[in-house]
A protein has these predicted regions:
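Acidic/histidine-rich, metal-coordinating catalytic segments
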Residues: 189-200
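Short, surface-exposed basic-aromatic patches at helix termini and helix-loop junctions that form
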Residues: 205-209
Length: 209
């Protein structure tokens, strides 16, 4: 229901691409739950006994057409779905026990390798493998999580960036949004923000205050 309410493609390049975004995005979620890590892998939810678990799924090519319609604004729409879903889940299940005490907000950037010369947004960034610094082509998502003394971390925000992006780019805004998400999820205690030295700048400190 959140997807149906939040996600809108008002000016599609391909009209069929914007049709029924909610069940198409649910197909992506179902595929990820089943182990898919690419668009082609989403076909696994249409085979074997999967149809007894997932109803009304779409072909990978159809999903790809929808995703190519997405812009940064649509990514923000999905972020709002994530925030409201977490808040709604916490109303029904004790996902964050101990949220009335101290909670921990962690932020970090990752480098996820991608392949192919035409991969949108991919660029070379530094990563460490077996203790050695190397350049690797990929995307650098910025991730925030919230946890407590009694609860494992849950994701409060994720944003894809080019592989060469500085770790601290956009961190202040991500932290502010993560704090708002944590409060909406029922965190009433003190929130301690944790990150490495890449986030030790005045804008991040201002967001934490």
């Amino acid at each position: 229901q959140l997807l149906a309410d939040k996600v809108r493609i008002s000016e599609p390049r391909i009209k069929s691409g914007s049709a029924n975004p909610s069940p198409k995005l649910l197909t992506v979620v179902a595929g990820m739950c089943a182990g898919a890590d690419s668009i082609d892998d989403l076909d696994l939810v249409r085979g074997g006994g999967m149809k007894t678990l997932f109803d009304g799924v779409y072909a990978p090519s159809t999903i790809g057409t929808l995703l190519r319609e997405f812009t940064f604004g649509h990514a923000r729409q999905l972020e709002s779905v994530l925030r409201e879903h977490l808040a709604g889940l916490c109303e029904r299940v004790d996902v964050l026990p101990g949220a009335d005490g101290r909670a921990y907000l962690d932020i970090d950037s990752l480098l996820r390798p991608v392949y192919g010369h035409a991969k949108q947004g991919a660029s070379y960034g530094h990563t460490k493998i077996s203790g050695k610094q190397i350049l690797r082509k990929g995307l650098a998502p910025l991730i925030t999580t919230i946890s407590t003394e009694c609860a494992a971390p849950v994701i409060t925000g994720a944003r894809l960036r080019a592989g060469k992006s500085n770790s601290g780019k956009g961190a202040a805004r991500m932290i502010a949004q993560a704090v708002a998400t944590a409060r909406a999820a029922g965190v009433t205690g003190q929130i301690l923000v944790r990150g490495d030295s890449a986030y030790g700048n005045s804008t991040v400190v201002a967001a934490c205050r």
